[in-house]
């Protein structure tokens, strides 16, 4: 090894030891011919001092991010010069030998100056990601990720799981998003697809008798750009045979408890649960943030006989802002703009005066009886503001759910040190395909219905006989885990019987021919004693970003993509040469298409 110690691990117990350190030059200070340098390696920082004239003369040439090796004696810092903010802050190294391992060019941004971190644009950071990762916070993010990986593996190996790698070159099968396609050079005109998840392969592993599988899996989805999404991402993927929902949930909670402990947090299990219907009714979201206690109150029945046209709608709901009646008019107007940015016409409101009198546009348009009872109905007290949404149920609840979060932010109700986990269970098995498309998802099949989770999720046992007769009422045997308003994992008990799987395909408008072509290998496998099985997949990037307190999942990915799936570091995606295009066979016609075209041409010539 080129060094004997790590810089950040030097302590008073090392005083009088001769040490060799390696690392990068951080901050440098010159004091009357004596040079002080913060030497940084993966463990942290140590102060090294150049006092001897010859070595100090050479140290004058050192600049930020030079890679160096130093040898010297560990000494106690002079009294009063200790740095309590550094683990090594009680000592320094008096350098006797200096070796420059490599020089550094002028930096595109400062690395050791935390005050400048927010001034560096993300494109620049990602273009020079290898420098960005030298920052303590960014390097620590990847080390935290490694610890989380190890913690999950520890739990799974304790339960006799087998880590298995599944293919990353497979066939294109519809799973809810667009596939990334890879041309197959040896079979011109055909393509592999990068997997959106290991879903089908892990189910086949259950058929194969592996019983307990896991994988830290890379997944790929060619989606339109959305905030804080990545075209390639990581899942902790887990599957088990001969289990029910309770077994999977218990294991998932054990994994999360162990992972959270790596960051020094203790979480209490079992986690609370709520149904999907309750989550939407009370919080306007299937991933509610439960760190604050604001709930939506349904007012549809209350206003069933109203003369106010705005409230003569399918749904009316409300949320209360504590003390919100004191907001100035400009703030109330800002709420209207906020709602319009979310596709709503506005956000109706009533102000409850300190004397209990109601004011605002809505108060003037509702009946005396409605004015007399609305505050009690929604739980508002003098000084509060009641915000309303009216319209179709789904979008109105979504608006109120967003308002709920905005109110909590404005009132400072969100405790960033708190972890609020909940399971959301009993989600619908199917949703209208039009709704899925409106949200930017790919609706599989050619039906009015598409799967909410995926096509391989089993219905709850009580809907097994009826889900294809009444798809809108069927509930999925599925469970999502939510933390602080973020969905961090989701799973289900899977279909393991061929006839049930074929019935699901029929509901989704996937013909027998298409099912056979795209999923025949899975249907065939179900014919050979497939066991009952289920599992869960955790969004690993999201979990690590939450653990580390990062604003974006990009901070916990070594080399992430920026907006639109572009990699500023390598400038990917890039064009290919004409030779590469020809060799890949990307423009070749598949044999079936070519044969069909030839047949059509022959027929037309007769």
From Swiss-Prot:
<keyword id="KW-0030">Aminoacyl-tRNA synthetase</keyword>
<dbReference type="InterPro" id="IPR047089">
    <property type="entry name" value="Asp-tRNA-ligase_1_N"/>
</dbReference>
<keyword id="KW-0436">Ligase</keyword>
<dbReference type="Pfam" id="PF02938">
    <property type="entry name" value="GAD"/>
</dbReference>
<dbReference type="InterPro" id="IPR002312">
    <property type="entry name" value="Asp/Asn-tRNA-synth_IIb"/>
</dbReference>
<feature type="region of interest" description="Aspartate">
    <location>
        <begin position="199"/>
        <end position="202"/>
    </location>
</feature>
<protein>
    <recommendedName>
        <fullName>Aspartate--tRNA(Asp/Asn) ligase</fullName>
        <ecNumber>6.1.1.23</ecNumber>
    </recommendedName>
</protein>
<feature type="binding site">
    <location>
        <position position="230"/>
    </location>
    <ligand>
        <name>ATP</name>
    </ligand>
</feature>
<dbReference type="GO" id="GO:0006422">
    <property type="term" value="P:aspartyl-tRNA aminoacylation"/>
</dbReference>
<feature type="site" description="Important for tRNA non-discrimination">
    <location>
        <position position="80"/>
    </location>
</feature>
<dbReference type="InterPro" id="IPR045864">
    <property type="entry name" value="aa-tRNA-synth_II/BPL/LPL"/>
</dbReference>
<keyword id="KW-0648">Protein biosynthesis</keyword>
<dbReference type="InterPro" id="IPR012340">
    <property type="entry name" value="NA-bd_OB-fold"/>
</dbReference>
<keyword id="KW-0963">Cytoplasm</keyword>
<dbReference type="InterPro" id="IPR004365">
    <property type="entry name" value="NA-bd_OB_tRNA"/>
</dbReference>
<comment type="subunit">
    <text>Homodimer.</text>
</comment>
<dbReference type="InterPro" id="IPR047090">
    <property type="entry name" value="AspRS_core"/>
</dbReference>
<dbReference type="Pfam" id="PF01336">
    <property type="entry name" value="tRNA_anti-codon"/>
</dbReference>
<dbReference type="InterPro" id="IPR029351">
    <property type="entry name" value="GAD_dom"/>
</dbReference>
<feature type="binding site">
    <location>
        <position position="221"/>
    </location>
    <ligand>
        <name>L-aspartate</name>
    </ligand>
</feature>
<feature type="binding site">
    <location>
        <position position="175"/>
    </location>
    <ligand>
        <name>L-aspartate</name>
    </ligand>
</feature>
<feature type="binding site">
    <location>
        <begin position="221"/>
        <end position="223"/>
    </location>
    <ligand>
        <name>ATP</name>
    </ligand>
</feature>
<keyword id="KW-0547">Nucleotide-binding</keyword>
<feature type="binding site">
    <location>
        <position position="453"/>
    </location>
    <ligand>
        <name>L-aspartate</name>
    </ligand>
</feature>
<feature type="binding site">
    <location>
        <position position="487"/>
    </location>
    <ligand>
        <name>ATP</name>
    </ligand>
</feature>
<dbReference type="Pfam" id="PF00152">
    <property type="entry name" value="tRNA-synt_2"/>
</dbReference>
<feature type="binding site">
    <location>
        <position position="494"/>
    </location>
    <ligand>
        <name>L-aspartate</name>
    </ligand>
</feature>
<feature type="region of interest" description="Disordered">
    <location>
        <begin position="564"/>
        <end position="606"/>
    </location>
</feature>
<dbReference type="InterPro" id="IPR004524">
    <property type="entry name" value="Asp-tRNA-ligase_1"/>
</dbReference>
<keyword id="KW-0067">ATP-binding</keyword>
<feature type="compositionally biased region" description="Low complexity">
    <location>
        <begin position="593"/>
        <end position="606"/>
    </location>
</feature>
<feature type="site" description="Important for tRNA non-discrimination">
    <location>
        <position position="31"/>
    </location>
</feature>
<dbReference type="GO" id="GO:0005524">
    <property type="term" value="F:ATP binding"/>
</dbReference>
<dbReference type="GO" id="GO:0050560">
    <property type="term" value="F:aspartate-tRNA(Asn) ligase activity"/>
</dbReference>
<dbReference type="GO" id="GO:0003676">
    <property type="term" value="F:nucleic acid binding"/>
</dbReference>
<dbReference type="InterPro" id="IPR004115">
    <property type="entry name" value="GAD-like_sf"/>
</dbReference>
<dbReference type="InterPro" id="IPR004364">
    <property type="entry name" value="Aa-tRNA-synt_II"/>
</dbReference>
<feature type="binding site">
    <location>
        <begin position="539"/>
        <end position="542"/>
    </location>
    <ligand>
        <name>ATP</name>
    </ligand>
</feature>
<dbReference type="GO" id="GO:0005737">
    <property type="term" value="C:cytoplasm"/>
</dbReference>
<comment type="function">
    <text>Aspartyl-tRNA synthetase with relaxed tRNA specificity since it is able to aspartylate not only its cognate tRNA(Asp) but also tRNA(Asn). Reaction proceeds in two steps: L-aspartate is first activated by ATP to form Asp-AMP and then transferred to the acceptor end of tRNA(Asp/Asn).</text>
</comment>
<dbReference type="InterPro" id="IPR006195">
    <property type="entry name" value="aa-tRNA-synth_II"/>
</dbReference>
<feature type="compositionally biased region" description="Basic and acidic residues">
    <location>
        <begin position="578"/>
        <end position="590"/>
    </location>
</feature>
């Amino acid at each position: 090894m080129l060094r004997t110690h790590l810089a950040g691990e030097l302590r008073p117990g090392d005083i009088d030891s001769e040490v060799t350190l390696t690392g990068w030059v951080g901050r440098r200070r010159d004091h009357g011919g004596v040079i002080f340098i913060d030497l940084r390696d993966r463990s942290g920082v140590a102060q090294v001092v150049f006092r001897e004239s010859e070595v100090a003369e050479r140290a004058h040439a050192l600049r930020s991010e030079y890679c160096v090796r130093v040898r010297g004696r560990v000494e106690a810092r002079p009294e009063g010069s200790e740095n309590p903010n550094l683990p090594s802050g009680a000592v320094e190294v008096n350098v006797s030998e200096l070796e420059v391992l490599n020089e550094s060019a002028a930096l595109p941004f400062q690395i050791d100056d935390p005050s400048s971190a927010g001034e560096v644009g993300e494109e620049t950071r990602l273009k020079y990601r290898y420098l960005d990762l030298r920052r303590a916070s960014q390097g620590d993010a990847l080390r935290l990720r490694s610890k989380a990986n190890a913690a999950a593996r520890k739990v799974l190996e304790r339960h006799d799981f087998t880590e298995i790698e599944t293919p990353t070159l497979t066939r294109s099968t519809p799973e809810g998003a667009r596939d990334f396609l890879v041309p197959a050079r040896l079979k011109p005109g055909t393509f592999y697809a990068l997997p959106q998840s290991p879903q089908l392969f892990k189910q086949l592993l259950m058929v194969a008798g592996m019983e307990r599988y896991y994988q830290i899996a890379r997944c790929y989805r060619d989606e339109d750009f959305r905030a804080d999404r990545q075209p390639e991402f990581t899942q902790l993927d887990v599957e088990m045979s001969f289990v029910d929902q309770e077994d999977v949930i218990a294991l998932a909670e054990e994994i999360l408890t162990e992972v959270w402990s790596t960051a020094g947090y203790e979480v209490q299990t079992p986690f609370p649960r709520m149904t999907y219907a309750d989550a939407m009714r009370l919080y306007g979201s299937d991933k509610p943030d439960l760190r604050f206690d604001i709930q939506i109150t349904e007012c549809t029945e209350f206003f069933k006989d109203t003369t106010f046209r705005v409230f003569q709608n399918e749904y009316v709901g409300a949320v209360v802002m504590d003390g919100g009646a004191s907001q100035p008019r400009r703030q109330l107007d800002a709420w209207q703009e906020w709602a319009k940015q979310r596709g709503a016409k506005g956000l109706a409101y009533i102000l409850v005066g300190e004397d209990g009198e109601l004011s605002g546009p809505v108060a003037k348009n509702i009946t005396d009886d409605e004015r007399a009872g609305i505050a009690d109905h929604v739980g508002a007290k003098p000084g509060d503001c009641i915000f309303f949404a009216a319209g179709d149920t789904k979008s109105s609840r979504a608006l109120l759910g967003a308002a709920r979060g905005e109110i909590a932010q404005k009132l400072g109700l969100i405790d960033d040190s708190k972890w609020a986990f909940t399971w959301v269970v009993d989600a619908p098995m199917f949703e209208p395909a039009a709704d899925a498309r409106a949200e930017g998802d790919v609706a599989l099949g050619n039906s009015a219905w598409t799967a909410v989770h995926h096509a391989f999720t089993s219905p709850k046992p009580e809907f097994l006989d009826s889900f294809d007769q009444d798809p809108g009422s069927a509930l999925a045997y599925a469970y999502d885990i939510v933390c602080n308003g973020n969905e961090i994992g989701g799973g289900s008990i899977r279909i393991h019987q061929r006839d049930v799987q074929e019935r699901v395909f029929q509901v989704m408008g996937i013909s027998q021919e298409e099912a056979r072509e795209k999923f025949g290998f899975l249907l065939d496998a179900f014919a050979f004693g497939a066991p009952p099985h289920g599992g869960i997949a955790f969004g690993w990037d999201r979990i690590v970003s939450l653990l580390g307190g990062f604003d974006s999942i990009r901070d916990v990915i070594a080399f992430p993509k920026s907006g639109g799936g572009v990699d500023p570091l390598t400038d990917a995606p890039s064009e290919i040469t004409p030779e590469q295009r020809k060799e890949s066979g990307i423009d070749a016609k598949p044999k079936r298409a070519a044969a069909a075209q030839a047949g059509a041409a022959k027929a037309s010539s007769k």
